[in-house]
């Protein structure tokens, strides 16, 4: 059965036919049948070079050999124990090695679960309730952060989700990203935490202005606020040590997900020992999950980190060169066509905004021409390239993309930009 038939069947048993809002686009999304390396194949037999990459999770590509072998071996040993394992200990040690700020780590299942735990932990540690987040930053689908969020909520125009109690939403102060004056005005000694995507990856790609992250660190330390880096996207993606290594700023608490698991669901929340010790059973901040430390996902994460650490000396420079060349090619082609555009890129993640003004925050991202982006997205699909169907997401490269893949992607963008004109 092809994608159209599958979607009609899905709508009868799945809300709107999809299990995550941003996966939908009219009239129906393609349904995946298989994926390998840098490409994905749909139920109709079409093959696409995959620049969605699991929304950035597949740094090593689909079906990386080391990950597949580790998962296959673990499936034979067991899939769920609900008691500690040696592999959990080794994974926490590896994470601490790559992220020295994560002196102690609790494994969870998703990035949203990690940020929920991080915020609860910060509130318990500081005995304060209020948090600061940034307009357009997305930190998962839970109440404290579904206020002026990015990702699918921005794409659908849902500023604050229904079902979030007003009292809870009032505990979240939302300010513009990259606005130092706004942060200085909001920071106070009644704030438990400041949570931020060090590079916004759920409002397109928006890098921090020079000195912005250092200001967050400085004022957080001065006022006793816990600085939370949500590295769900940037972790392992910008470097083996994430954004905190790339920008030289250490948070109090870090969340990791996506690339951590190499395509399997796993996340982590970690920080200074004196903070993490507040988690139950040693402390009174409660967090628990049946599938936390799931041995199959842990085996995938171990294989992913070990592979990344082994090849990082050539992996990140290669991805940087490839992404820089692709972004430059897209910019040149757009200029030749007379299109207003901004190509925002950090390391191997990027986004095309159809606008003449620099995109530095959620407001400027929302002023970009979303209808033109949609035309480009559909033309890319037609020409065999899959990117996320929203300008408020990102495109990314993986270790599996070949020179030929990137040549084809560049040509597809050239054609798609023409269609968007």
From Swiss-Prot:
Pfam families the record matches: Aminotran_3
Q: Which family is it part of?
A: Belongs to the class-III pyridoxal-phosphate-dependent aminotransferase family. HemL subfamily.
In short, the EC number is 5.4.3.8
Cofactor(s) required, per the database record: pyridoxal 5'-phosphate
Catalysed reactions listed for this entry: (S)-4-amino-5-oxopentanoate = 5-aminolevulinate
User: Could you tell me where this protein is found in the cell?
Assistant: Cytoplasm
Q: Name one GO cellular component term.
A: cytoplasm
Q: Which UniProt keywords apply?
A: Cytoplasm, Isomerase, Porphyrin biosynthesis, Pyridoxal phosphate
What this protein is called in its record is Glutamate-1-semialdehyde 2,1-aminomutase 1
Molecular-function annotations in GO: glutamate-1-semialdehyde 2,1-aminomutase activity; pyridoxal phosphate binding; transaminase activity
HAMAP family (UniProt xref): HemL_aminotrans_3 (MF_00375)
One of this protein's GO BP terms? Answer: protoporphyrinogen IX biosynthetic process
The encoding gene: hemL1
Q: Which organism is it from?
A: Cenarchaeum symbiosum (strain A)
Residues that the record marks as modified (N6-(pyridoxal phosphate)lysine) are: 258
Question: What EC class is this?
Answer: isomerase
In terms of InterPro entries, this protein maps to:
4pyrrol_synth_GluAld_NH2Trfase (IPR004639), Aminotrans_3 (IPR005814), PyrdxlP-dep_Trfase (IPR015424), PyrdxlP-dep_Trfase_major (IPR015421), PyrdxlP-dep_Trfase_small (IPR015422)
Presence of keyword Isomerase: yes
Task: Cite the annotated pathway.
Answer: Porphyrin-containing compound metabolism; protoporphyrin-IX biosynthesis; 5-aminolevulinate from L-glutamyl-tRNA(Glu): step 2/2
């Amino acid at each position: 059965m092809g994608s159209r038939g599958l979607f009609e069947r899905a709508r009868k048993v799945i809300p709107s036919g999809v299990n995550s809002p941003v996966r939908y686009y009219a009239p129906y999304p393609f349904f995946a049948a298989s994926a390998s390396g840098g490409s994905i194949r749909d139920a109709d037999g079409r093959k696409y070079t995959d620049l969605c990459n699991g929304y950035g999770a597949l740094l090593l590509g689909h079906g990386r050999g080391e990950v597949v072998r580790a998962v296959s071996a673990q499936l034979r040993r067991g899939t769920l124990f609900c008691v500690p394992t040696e592999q959990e200990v080794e994974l926490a040690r590896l994470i601490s090695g790559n992220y020295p700020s994560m002196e102690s780590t609790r494994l969870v299942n998703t990035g949203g679960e990690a940020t929920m735990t991080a915020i609860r932990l910060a509130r318990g540690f500081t005995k304060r309730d209020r948090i600061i987040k940034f307009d357009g930053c997305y930190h998962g689908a839970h109440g404290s952060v579904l206020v002026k969020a990015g990702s699918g909520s921005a794409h659908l125009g849902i500023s604050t989700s229904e079902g979030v109690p007003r009292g809870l939403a009032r505990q979240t102060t939302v300010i513009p990203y990259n606005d130092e004056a706004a942060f200085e005005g909001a920071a106070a000694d009644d704030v438990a935490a400041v949570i931020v995507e060090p590079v916004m990856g759920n409002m397109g790609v928006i890098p921090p202005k020079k000195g912005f992250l250092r200001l967050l660190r400085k004022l957080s330390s001065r006022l006793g606020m816990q600085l939370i880096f949500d590295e769900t996207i940037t972790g392992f993606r910008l470097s083996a040590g994430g954004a905190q290594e790339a920008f030289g700023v250490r948070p109090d608490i870090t969340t990791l997900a996506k690339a951590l698991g190499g395509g399997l669901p796993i996340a982590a929340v970690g920080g200074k020992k004196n903070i993490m010790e507040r988690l139950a059973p040693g402390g009174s901040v409660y967090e628990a999950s049946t599938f936390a430390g799931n041995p199959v996902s842990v085996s995938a994460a171990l294989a992913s980190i070990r592979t990344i650490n082994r090849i990082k000396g050539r992996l990140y420079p290669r991805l940087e060169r490839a992404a820089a060349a692709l972004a430059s090619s897209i910019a040149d082609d757009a200029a030749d066509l007379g299109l207003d555009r901004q190509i925002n890129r950090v390391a191997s993640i990027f986004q095309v905004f159809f606008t003449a003004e620099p995109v530095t925050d959620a407001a400027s991202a929302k002023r970009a021409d979303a209808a033109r982006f949609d035309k480009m997205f559909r033309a890319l699909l037609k020409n065999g390239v899959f990117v996320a169907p929203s300008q408020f997401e990102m495109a990314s490269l993986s270790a599996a993309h070949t020179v030929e893949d990137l040549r084809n992607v560049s040509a597809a963008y050239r054609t798609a930009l023409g269609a968007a004109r």
